[in-house]
Amino acid sequence: MVFGFTKRDRRVPDLSRYDYYYQNHEDYNKSPQLSAAAASAASAASPDRTNYSRSHSLVSHAPSIPRQRSSVKSPGRRLSTSSAAPPTSRAAAKQYSQKTYSLRSQRSGEYHLHPPGYTTNGSRMNSMTSGANVRRNYGKNKSTAGNNNDSRANSITVKTTQVTDPSGRTQSITKKTIRKINGYEYVETTTTTKNLVPLGDSQRHFDEFSENYMLQDDDILEEQASDNIHDIIEENETDNEKPYSPVSESHLQDDSELNVEKPDFPLGSYFHHKYSTDVMPLEEESSLSNFSDALDYIPPTHQTSSKYIHNKRKQASTTRRKKRPPAVKNAEAEAKKPLTEAEMYLKALEVAKRNVYHTDAASDNASAPLGSNKSRKSRMGQKMTLRSSSDSPTATANLVKSNVEVQPKRFTSSFFSRNTKSAPHEVHNHSVSTHFKSNKAVDPVPEPKSANTGLTDKEMYDQALKIAQARYYNSHGIQPEAVDNSTTAAKPRQVGVSHLGSTGSIPPNEQHYLGDSEIPVQSEVHEYEPIPLQKTKTTGSSKNKFKTMFDKVLQFSQENYGYQHKKEQGEQTPVTRNAEESFPAASISEGVTTAKPSSNEGVMTNPVVTDSPSPLQQQIDSTTASSNGQSQGNVPTSAVASTTRTRSPELQDNLKSSSSLLQDQTPQRQEDATDPTTSSTNELSAAEPTMVTSTHATKTIQAQTQDPPTKHKKSSFFTKLFKKKSSR
């Protein structure tokens, strides 16, 4: 029970339905004593009526007080008045804080329980209460008031009232603090008014857009107006043509005083409307015209330069000017008349052509009448079309004459130089927008619209290609003849590989080379260095590709381990068998002896000795020792001989083609390399001899077959054992 009572005493009652705005303020005292005092203050007390006291504050017990108005502005102890009605005026636009102090007895609430006319002997009351609270508290029990006197002692009550305007902004905050000490109430009222904007500001800002600001713009123009009437006319031609409507008679008088010299214009002209004073004001025309110039309004600034007026005049409309052409008959005004858009375009085109072609000849387009129905093309259309509008005979002749002086400075196109056979005196034009036909070079006739139908697709393509080349050469300043010579010199020479022997007779057992003759060869270290070869492009089926891949795997395993030569002997093709049968016969008849392999700096070389070696063979033998990776000195001679005879047809074709390329001594740079591991020094390439026999000569080349670089594995016990067995 004790635990429950203590918990109930510390519990704060929920007063959010009465004072929900207290929760958002930090200075609100949320102690349980305050809530208990507020609950006890809600119940009225009725002590003995004979005792009375004076109250120096007028308190209203009506519902929430939206606004408070003070009758005395000076701070200190004063009579504070609370009212439920809204004020008729607002305070000045500044923040101020007022505090009022009042002393009131706790028994002052007894007067709220009776009608306003009920009084006792000798009782005085200096406070007035509203009738709403009196009617509400009139029928309450009197005996329940005296029991709560002790609970109301020594308590503090804070009440805060916040007043907002319809737009949601805070206007004033009133904080009322009531301290009850020893039966007395100390009332402290603090009012903070936040009126940042006066009353009429919003309405004044809204009314600014309903006025006419035509006179303000005209004043800016009139300050810089000169005495010459023609300058005024020139300014008014490009001015924004807004309806002129005065606001008041004072502005009309100022306007008439500034414009002393007013020209006499016709009644229907534009300038008569500009300077006339009998125009209906803008506000009187319609209700919608009040905001017609809201977008055109420019706030007046202190900058009155001509640049400001020029930027404002860019908004002038051209349609109004066409409807009301100026009726000025003065010669100077006609001389200063602004150009139309078409005339400006023609002048700009003439200047551009003069800058491009470096000539002073005027363009024919400028002299053309404006009313001509000749359709103009845009610059993008002229660039994208092959046949430009300057193909007419007059334009072509003028452009040819204009380029006579500039001709030595430019390069001559090979396409246009072909026409010199028929007309040697004619000077050809190198401009981008003109071209000539190759079949008619004397007098070009303007083509009809259906001229494209007479050409075939191939002819049109050829002409377009020539025109594009000529334009490219002219734009980059390249001489086409030099380009043709450089392209012919840069083309790779076609190497004709001869597959015949020295006498031209081929034995029936020799293989013919049918692959591509242009094999990319890489020689970066020396001219006669052994060159790594790439696999030729096989045009066979996927089965052949799989075969070559399988041969590569066998070759790699054979070169690295050296004990798989027996497996490869059973996979020989019939073509290689025929070639193998010819190898012993040729070697026996010509006395070819195979020397034992000797390792030189870790590189195995297998030279083939012949009776009369050729000079090319001596050069090849002198360059066979290269810095390649792995030594194969432990492979026996019989294994080398067997591996030499077990070459696939693709590899033999590669070796034959490489020998023919070395004969011609025309090494080319490798461009279409497919293996990314190709470099000038291959780490794991093995040098093996291959004998290609013919009727009278035996040529030997030491080819390097490319293998992908692999990491060297440590030789295990089994690999050493297999190597020992193979060496035995």
Curated annotation (Swiss-Prot):
Membrane topology field: Peripheral membrane protein
GO biological process terms, alphabetically, are: reciprocal meiotic recombination
In this chain, composition skew of type Basic and acidic residues spans: 251-261
List where Polar residues composition bias occurs. 48-58, 95-106, 118-132, 140-171, 363-373, 385-403, 590-634, 654-668, 675-684, 691-708
**Where does this protein have compositionally biased stretches of type Low complexity?**
35-46, 80-93, 635-646
Locate the Phosphoserine modifications and list their residues.
57, 64, 127, 151, 155, 363, 660
- List keywords of the entry alphabetically: Cell membrane, DNA recombination, Meiosis, Membrane, Phosphoprotein
Using the UniProt annotation, give all residue ranges assigned to the region (Disordered): 33-171, 236-261, 300-335, 363-403, 422-454, 495-514, 561-728
* Main location per the UniProt record: membrane
Its annotated compartments are:
Cell membrane
Q: Does the keyword Chloroplast apply?
A: no
Entry annotated with the keyword Aminoacyl-tRNA synthetase: no
GO cellular-component term (any)? plasma membrane
Q: Could you tell me where the Basic residues compositional bias lies?
A: 309-326, 711-728
Give residue numbers for the modification (Phosphothreonine). 646
**What is the purpose of this protein?**
May be involved in the control of meiotic sister-chromatid recombination.
The miscellaneous annotation reads: Present with 131 molecules/cell in log phase SD medium.
Record's protein name:
Meiotic sister-chromatid recombination protein 3
Originating gene: MSC3
